[in-house]
């Protein structure tokens, strides 16, 4: 098969180690995919809330909602299930669970909180109606909700995606771009989307106190 892919009159030397690595990756993916489906079927996907501090007062002013799987007494991070979730088309299922569960929990306080959404969510075209339903169900003020999108979504400029994000903004929901600066940064697109928050990529932040270039980039942003 490898020789055919290389073209006519070509050959490929079989390397058992090469295929054992591929096989190991395949088995790991299958295991992760099975774990994810088990978590979905058994209501094991839960929200974790990471506090966001005000740099001046050091007080928590809002929370970021993070997806986790709680299984067999262990907490599993997205690193172990995000790839199979994307390849299996299950990211919107996870997003809906995060929205529902975080809204239910946050209904008991007045903090603002952010939830991550993906390009897959926008491709399904369900967010506007679903979030409106959950806002009403849990009596959450739209101004408390922040939706985080990756920079790639906003810079891709798909008209339908931008239309959906604008509709969410019209509900009173805030928008944030996550990991800004990790891809091609389109400032014009930020203006088009009327973004409320920019979460600058960590590579610019981690050395901001010692690296003049990082400082200047962040200051410019």
Regions picked out by a protein language model, each given a short descriptive name:
Residues 1-8, 79, 180:
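Catalytic-core segments of nucleotide cyclases and related cyclic-nucleotide turnover enzymes
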Residues 5-46, 56, 85-89, 121-124, ...:
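C-di-GMP signaling machinery
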């Amino acid at each position: 098969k490898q020789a055919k892919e290389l073209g006519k009159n070509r050959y490929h030397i079989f390397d058992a180690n090469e295929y054992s690595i591929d096989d190991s990756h395949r088995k790991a993916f299958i295991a992760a995919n099975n774990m994810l489906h088990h978590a979905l079927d058994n209501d094991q996907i839960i929200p974790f809330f990471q506090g966001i501090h005000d740099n001046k007062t050091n007080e928590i002013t809002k929370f970021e909602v993070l997806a986790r799987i709680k299984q067999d007494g262990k907490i599993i991070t997205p690193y172990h299930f995000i790839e199979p979730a994307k390849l299996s088309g299950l990211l919107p299922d996870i997003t809906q669970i995060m929205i529902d569960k975080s809204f239910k929990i946050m209904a008991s306080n007045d903090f603002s909180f952010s939830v991550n959404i993906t390009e897959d969510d926008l491709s399904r075209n369900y967010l506007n109606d679903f979030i409106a339903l959950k806002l009403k169900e849990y009596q959450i003020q739209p101004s408390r909700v922040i939706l985080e999108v990756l920079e790639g979504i906003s810079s891709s400029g798909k008209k339908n995606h931008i239309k959906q994000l604008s509709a969410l903004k019209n509900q009173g929901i805030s928008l944030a771009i996550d990991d800004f600066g990790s891809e091609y940064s389109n400032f014009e697109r930020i203006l088009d989307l009327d973004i409320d928050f920019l979460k600058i990529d960590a590579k610019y932040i981690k050395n901001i106190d010692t690296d003049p270039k990082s400082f200047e980039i962040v200051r410019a942003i």
